[in-house]
Amino acid sequence: MKNLAKYSMLIFIMLCGLLVLPAQANPEEGFNSSFGFMPAEFDFEHAREAGGYWDRPFFELFEWGTIEPEEGKFDFYMTDRYVRRVQEHGFHTLANIQPFANWDQKLCHEDLPGIRSPMGFQTKGKPCNMEAYKSFVISLVERYDGDGKDDMPGLKYPIKYWEVANEPEMQEEPLVFFQGSPKDYFEILKATYEAVKEADSEAQVVQGGMAGMADWMVSFWQKVFDLGAASYFDIANMHSIGHGEHLNIPSFKKFLSENNASEKPFWITEVQIEDRRDKKTSTEYAASLARSYIFALANGARKLFYVNLRLPEHLPSQEEGGPGFSDLSTLVDSSGNLTPLFYAHLTVVLKLEDFHKVEKIKEKISGKTILEGQYRFFKDNRVIYVLWGKGSPSSEIEGEVKVTDISGSEKILASDSIQLTNSPIFVEKIEL
């Protein structure tokens, strides 16, 4: 409990923006990037150096009750501070709308048990006054849409992606993100979608992230989709916290297809490759991160948000609702040193950002591991082969080639001398 209190205080301090701001802003740069962090706030400088352009910040920042603490009285102080801070660091925001305000919850949810949160105890039921909630969403989106009307003073990076709550199927301590039925969440999703589009027709609505593909999780979401959810979001959203290098993508794509939503782009807004029950070294996790990101991009993921950028000073235990991560899977360790995962992330970004086409040569999944991966990524006017597994590369790779490993180290090698391992390499023909 003490650790949770310290962690809550850390979040509160960071929400208030009590840190130095560097100067930079180019609103278009990185908007189409595939790479982000949750949250980049823990280390903006290294998040950018690792190739990230997107932040999925603390949920409390865009919570109804944070911004409208009393009905009809808006206070954007903390949210504005965050938006100014994140845009000065050159990051775009995926904002997570939390549809909870204490004054509203008291109207019809006094029977619900209070849930611990960084902002105190609260209930997390469906809004009692849905029209008041929609009015809040309209005001929120209008403030950050960048249309010049009622915008935040100094807004440079408009917010164009709005996520509707988080893992609503998670309803048992120590992780309770929602207290309600699939129908309740569907009604929130529909109301939010309508309000977002009314305020900004160009904005995109992101489904609240699915916590995973366990049967009980899928059961909740199937009921949401049965009510017509696919009509009320633009981007599908999956999480994978230690679920394997496949990041739940094959089963999630199957689920979307079965629910007539296969045409929806999808993001993985929580990625963590550390397995709490099978600890590995940072070097092994770096290879795992590279395999999972390459696999995800090759299989259609549009954006990836890595969770364990850097550990906060005080992290609650797993029993207290903490994530159970360690320094083994951070990009920046507790001493501020860059880890092998940092370089693996950066190398994937440098090699594959802005690719326009990908072809699979070979792919093999076994349990949680992508045992083999061979792909052709087309970027600019060249082909980048990304390879791992066993044996030699495809015979179509001939002569001398440039080989880059996941640390970013480059060598010129004869193609017939290359032997694949479980650590991906990027192979490019040498331009004459």
Predicted regions mapped to residue ranges:
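Bacterial N-terminal signal peptides that target proteins for export
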Residues: 1-9
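Bacterial N-terminal signal peptides
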Residues: 9-19
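N-terminal substrate-binding region of glycoside hydrolase catalytic domains
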Residues: 26-159, 163, 169, 173-175
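Conserved, mostly hydrophobic/aromatic
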Residues: 86, 140, 162, 192, ...
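Active-site cleft segment of glycoside hydrolase catalytic domains centered on the general acid/base Glu
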Residues: 108-233, 240-254, 271, 275-291, ...
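Aromatic- and carboxylate-lined catalytic core of secreted/periplasmic carbohydrate-active enzymes
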Residues: 293-393, 425-426
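Beta-strand-rich binding/interaction modules
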Residues: 392-412
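C-terminal beta-strand-rich structural cap/linker in extracellular carbohydrate-active enzymes
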Residues: 412-432
